[in-house]
């Protein structure tokens, strides 16, 4: 008798569980479907063009010495994580960029090497060069910027950079 009841019990449990789960869509499935639809409509090349244009403006404003305009490129909750300094948040960004300009840096050149991400956030990696008077290179390094989409515009959310030069003795 136990040989007959045990398989029937397991069979009925399996059928009951299978029937309860078939034809239903979980929240996770719906979120996945929505995310895939959003990702399909996201154009990384278009985002790259926007980032390239923003970087061109940033370099021009740096060359003009406009630290207030440089700070305006950042998201409301954006910050710069510069070497040998505390993190600079929105209210301190103009002062930070102003200090770089006053230190004798005349020009900043940014070269993007990679961009990856989605319609909400992008990660840009690249290299930079800093120039003094007479186009003299004073530093070369690398950077990572996390870009945040704020109301349809890409804004710098996290900006970190460091030199590729050997330490000075």
Model-predicted regions and their roles:
Residues 25-26, 142-165:
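Short beta-strand edge/turn micro-motifs at domain boundaries
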Residues 49-50, 67-118:
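A solvent-exposed, acidic/Ser-Thr-rich amphipathic alpha-helical stretch
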Residues 120-128:
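A short hydrophobic beta-strand element
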């Amino acid at each position: 008798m136990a040989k007959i009841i045990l398989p029937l019990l397991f069979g009925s449990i399996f059928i009951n569980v299978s029937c309860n789960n078939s034809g239903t869509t979980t929240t996770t499935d719906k979120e996945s479907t929505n995310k895939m639809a959003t990702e399909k409509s996201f154009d990384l090349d278009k985002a790259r063009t926007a980032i390239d244009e923003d970087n061109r403006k940033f370099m021009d404003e740096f060359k003009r010495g406009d630290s207030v305009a440089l700070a305006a490129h950042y998201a409301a909750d954006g910050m710069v994580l510069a070497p040998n300094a505390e993190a600079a948040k929105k209210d301190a960004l103009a002062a930070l960029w102003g200090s770089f300009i006053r230190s004798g840096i005349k020009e900043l050149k940014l070269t993007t090497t990679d961009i990856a991400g989605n319609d909400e956030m992008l990660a840009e990696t690249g290299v930079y060069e800093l120039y003094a008077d007479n186009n003299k290179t004073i530093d070369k390094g690398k950077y990572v910027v996390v870009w945040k989409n704020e109301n349809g515009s890409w804004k710098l959310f996290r900006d970190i950079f460091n030199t590729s030069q050997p330490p000075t003795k």
